[in-house]
Amino acid sequence: MNKIIEVNNVSYHYDKEHALENIHFQVEKGSFTGLIGPNGSGKSTMLKLILGVLKKQQGSIALFGEKQADFKDWVKIGFVSQKSNAFNSAFPATVKEVVASGLTKKKGLFKTLNNQDKEAIDYALKRVEMTDYLHRNIGELSGGQQQRVFIARALVSRPELLILDEPTVGVDVENVKAFYELLAELNRTEEMTLLLVTHDLVAVNTYVNHVISINKRIIFDGSAHEYQHYLADRELEILAEQRRREDACLDCDASPV
């Protein structure tokens, strides 16, 4: 099974406004994919469709080779929202309790933690270097520390796919690089498939190996190396267009009155 996500000709609209038009792409097993685009480009809508929050209106989506409508093994997918720390900054739960909540997909609600669960929590916190904060309240931590805890919550069930929606929102600049290094290590050492929604082109150029750019439709889909060439070509096109406009203006100025 090499294709973790398959999106084929998916369209979605809100009332009469098209949010997505004929979107098609694949996320391969073991890839670190960046999904990018300007505000209002449909990135969040695409994530909601993949995660089943919204129902597609046209096209098909498959997860791990299964039609999304038939997919039941959601424990394979971890999700980190951009608003995790905003929702929990004043919440009195401990780090252990927050991470343990990531086991509900596997165990159900209000289940007592067994030794295997405790080992899973320990594993997840070690991966994000937060074991010393086990009994600290989540509200006491910085934005970067909180987001590491929420990655641990996503990792505790050992997902094969980790989806992150603008995960560095609210993270101080000093911790952003360390955060992306952590994601790259998970991709490299755990062979975990990552789908990262971001505006951070530095992160895209530095860490991901597959880029999908959308603006209500597919703009680019290829390797990170190909994307750098694409950007360079686009910059040359923009400069050429500016030169044509400048030349046209000069011609207008030179015309006799």
Curated annotation (Swiss-Prot):
SUPFAM superfamilies: P-loop containing nucleoside triphosphate hydrolases (SSF52540)
Entry GO MF terms: ATP binding; ATP hydrolysis activity
Keywords: ATP-binding, Nucleotide-binding, Transport, Zinc
Ranges of residues in domain ABC transporter: 5-241
Keyword Thylakoid recorded: no
Residues annotated as binding ATP: 37-44
InterPro entries per UniProt: AAA+_ATPase, ABC_transporter-like_ATP-bd, ABC_transporter-like_CS, Metal_Ion_Import_ABC, P-loop_NTPase
Keyword Zinc: yes
Family, similarity comment: Belongs to the ABC transporter superfamily.
Protein's job: Involved in a zinc uptake transport system.
Protein name: Zinc uptake system ATP-binding protein ZurA
